[in-house]
Regions:
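Core catalytic alpha/beta fold that binds nucleotide/phospho-ligands
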Residues: 1-137
Length: 138
């Protein structure tokens, strides 16, 4: 089930889900920050396979370089859910999302008014989104 709650001065929307459902379209206002928290433990083998199919060949190759399975899972969930959420914000297919690396290695989406950042620790992944601004989450 998808859940959201506003915190601080109602401009920060904390979003999370525990059954894998995300609506087809997500709107983000100029004044909002959306932060999604994902628990890798909630994804079974079937969901992992579906998420793997969303990644590009380059992302799959990068994922395969991780030695530990836990690191591979973090990468898989983080990057595929990033694509899924961006697709909902921008009304595109997840596989049509083009992600590039900046000169400092930070992912970004060219020619988009939605900025994002990804962070992970243990079994958790955090994805933050904002419109017309830059964002970082750690």
């Amino acid at each position: 089930m998808f859940k959201s709650e506003r915190v601080f001065d109602d401009n920060l929307l904390l979003s999370y889900f525990d059954d894998g459902y995300i609506s087809d379209r997500i709107a983000i206002k100029d004044s909002e920050i959306h932060v999604w928290f994902l628990d890798i433990g909630n994804y079974d083998e079937y969901h992992m396979k579906s998420l793997f199919d969303i990644l590009t060949l380059d992302e799959k190759a990068k994922m395969s370089h991780y030695v530990h399975v836990a690191d591979q899972k973090r990468f898989l969930v983080g990057h595929s859910m990033l694509r899924i959420l961006l697709s909902r914000y921008l009304a595109r297919e997840p596989t049509d999302i083009i992600l590039l690396n900046s000169k400092h290695g930070k992912l970004y989406m060219p020619q988009s008014n939605v900025s994002f950042n990804i962070s992970h620790s243990g079994n958790r992944v955090a994805l933050a989104f904002v419109k017309e601004k830059k964002i970082g989450v750690d």
